[in-house]
Amino acid sequence: MGMKIVVGDDVVVISGKDKGKMGKVIKVLRKKHFGKDVSFAIVSGVNICKKSVKATQKSDGGIINIAKPINLSNIALFDSTLGIRTRVGYKFIDEKKVRFMKSSGKVIE
């Protein structure tokens, strides 16, 4: 099965504490949980948490901001041409399966 959201996509958060925020997908995480596929994405500037880091010989301690994963069901692809969120579809062009935006029909590279 193809992934609807991949690294480098511009996405918008559709539910949760960061609803309405936009960012770029940094990493996509997939795993199985009780036989079901559970997918998460790390998005820049979204779901930021503070973490206390203990001092070591190589680095100083302190509080740092890290981006936590967000469930793929809580984000949607952002169509920059229309300025709205959109769904992802698949179609074949020259016997090659490609993703496209359902709102504008634009092919996603």
From Swiss-Prot:
InterPro entries: KOW (IPR005824), Rib_uL2_dom2 (IPR014722), Ribosomal_uL24 (IPR003256), Ribosomal_uL24_CS (IPR005825), Ribosomal_uL24_KOW (IPR041988), Translation_prot_SH3-like_sf (IPR008991). The keyword Ribosomal protein applies. One of its GO terms (biological process) is translation. Coiled coil: none annotated. The keyword rRNA-binding applies. It comes from the Bacteria. CDD domains: KOW_RPL26. Keywords: Ribonucleoprotein, Ribosomal protein, RNA-binding, rRNA-binding. GO terms for molecular function: rRNA binding; structural constituent of ribosome. Part of the 50S ribosomal subunit. One of two assembly initiator proteins, it binds directly to the 5'-end of the 23S rRNA, where it nucleates assembly of the 50S subunit. Belongs to the universal ribosomal protein uL24 family. PANTHER family: MITOCHONDRIAL RIBOSOMAL PROTEIN L24 (PTHR12903). This is Large ribosomal subunit protein uL24. It comes from Ehrlichia canis (strain Jake).
